[in-house]
Amino acid sequence: MNLSLRRSTSALLASSLLLTIGHGATLPFMTIYLSRQYSLSVDLIGYAMTIALTIGVVFSLGFGILADKFDKKRYMLLAITAFASGFIAIPLVNNVTLVVLFFALINCAYSVFATVLKAWFADNLSSTSKTKIFSINYTMLNIGWTIGPPLGTLLVMQSINLPFWLAAICSA
C-alpha cells in the first residue's frame, strides 16, 4: 500500500471511530433529551425516534445507491458535514419537529458515511489489504460504541447539550 493510500485509509478509519463515538454518545440520550427539553411523553418519544430512524434508513438506501455514481471522498465529506451540522443544530433549535428532522439527517449521514466508506475500501484497497482494513474498521466501530455511551453519560450529567457538542467536535 503506497503512502498516500495508507494515510487516506488511516484518516478514514479514525473518522469512522470518531463518528461512532459521537453517535454513541448521543443516541442513547435522545429519549432523555426529548423528555427534558420538550416534555414529551414516552409514546411520543417512541414515535419521534421511530420516524427519525426510519427517515434516516430510507434516505440512506437511496444515497447508498448513488454512491457508486459520484466521487466517494466528496460524498463522505458531505455526510460528515451533514452529521456535524445536525449535532450543532439540535441544541440550538427550540422545535421538536426540527430536532426529529435533524436527528433523521444525522442517522442518514452516519449510514451514508458507513456505506460509502466500505465502498471506498473495496474500490481502493488490494485484495490482501481489504480483509485487514475491514476488520480494523469493525473494531473501530465496536470501540466507538463502547466508548460513546459512557462518555455521553458523563457529559449529560453536566449538561443535556454536551453530548451533542461532543458529537459535533468528533465529526470535525
Positions of predicted regions on the chain:
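Cytoplasmic helix-loop-helix junction between adjacent transmembrane helices
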Residues: 104-141
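Helix-loop boundary and gating motifs at the non-cytosolic
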Residues: 3-53
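Helix-loop junctions at membrane interfaces in 12-TM secondary transporters
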Residues: 91-103
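Residue-level signature of mid-helix packing/kink "hotspots" within the transmembrane helices
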Residues: 53-61, 145-146
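Helix-to-loop junctions at the C-terminal end of transmembrane segments
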Residues: 59-71, 156
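Symmetry-related core transmembrane helices of the 12-TM Major Facilitator Superfamily/SLC fold
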Residues: 163-172
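Structural signature of the two symmetry-related core transmembrane helices
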Residues: 74-89
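Transmembrane alpha-helix termini and helix-breaking/packing motifs in multi-pass membrane transporters
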Residues: 147-163
